[in-house]
């Protein structure tokens, strides 16, 4: 269904409620440049990494899995026996995910706050456009928990909206991104209303800050797999 959520001002902070879940797939496709390409790229690197896994049934977590799009891609790309656990604290989102993946018996979803649970040892984690919504003081805690739960040679995918450390470049990047959204059919008002709703909810870091954060929790190998203006996909490997 087409995203018309911000035709008018919400009058409240953005949250992942039933109204958002109803249009979320369209919102993702029209708001994140090269969204599907990043999903496929991330799935490829996880699939390649799993070839080195000694676990007969590797476990993969998707934290903030929303409507389950990444698991749809993973199930298509990975041929070996795997277990997928998607975690999100929005039940409306998970209902969409469960419907999409109901035929995949290897895929399970949990409606919990992933900041408050312990993870099993896993071969891979994904945080796709999620870290930016977590309070800055909690990001390092979460990433350290993920690092400690990753098996040796396991990987973490991080997709993020980012900012430039240069004020002028950051302004230009934002302007280009708004032009992109206009070309996707969003009006000036919709862009402005969404920006207002996301203020202090979505807090982006720079590319350098995100890489430094990953390195600070123990990752020695962090690479940018993809970057378009103010969006990036990172992979970090535990060695």
UniProtKB/Swiss-Prot annotation:
It comes from Helicobacter acinonychis (strain Sheeba). Homodimer. The lineage of its organism: Bacteria, Pseudomonadati, Campylobacterota, Epsilonproteobacteria, Campylobacterales. Keywords: S-adenosyl-L-methionine, Transferase. Catalyzes the conversion of S-adenosyl-L-methionine (SAM) to carboxy-S-adenosyl-L-methionine (Cx-SAM). This is Carboxy-S-adenosyl-L-methionine synthase. It catalyses: prephenate + S-adenosyl-L-methionine = carboxy-S-adenosyl-L-methionine + 3-phenylpyruvate + H2O. Belongs to the class I-like SAM-binding methyltransferase superfamily. Cx-SAM synthase family. It comes from the Bacteria.
């Amino acid at each position: 269904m087409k995203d018309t959520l911000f035709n008018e001002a919400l009058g409240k902070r953005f949250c992942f409620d039933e109204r958002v879940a109803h249009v979320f797939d369209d919102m993702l496709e029209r708001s994140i440049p090269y969204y599907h390409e990043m999903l496929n790229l991330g799935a490829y690197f996880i699939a390649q990494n799993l070839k080195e896994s000694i676990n007969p049934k590797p476990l993969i977590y998707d934290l903030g899995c929303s409507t389950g799009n990444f698991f749809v891609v993973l199930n298509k790309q990975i041929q070996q026996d795997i277990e997928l656990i998607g975690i999100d604290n929005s039940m409306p989102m998970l209902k969409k995910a469960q419907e999409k993946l109901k035929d995949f018996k290897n895929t399970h979803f949990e409606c919990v706050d992933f900041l408050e649970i312990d993870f099993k040892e896993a071969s891979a984690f994904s945080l796709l456009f999620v870290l930016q919504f977590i309070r800055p003081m909690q990001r390092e805690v979460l990433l350290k928990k993920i690092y400690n739960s990753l098996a040796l040679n396991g990987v973490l995918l991080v997709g993020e909206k980012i900012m430039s450390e240069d004020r002028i470049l950051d302004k230009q990047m934002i302007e280009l991104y708004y032009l992109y959204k206009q070309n996707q059919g969003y009006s000036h008002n919709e862009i402005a209303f969404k920006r207002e709703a996301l203020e202090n909810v979505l807090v982006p870091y720079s590319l350098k800050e995100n890489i430094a954060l990953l390195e600070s929790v123990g990752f020695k190998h962090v690479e940018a797999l993809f970057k378009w203006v103010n969006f990036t996909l990172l992979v970090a490997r535990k060695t």
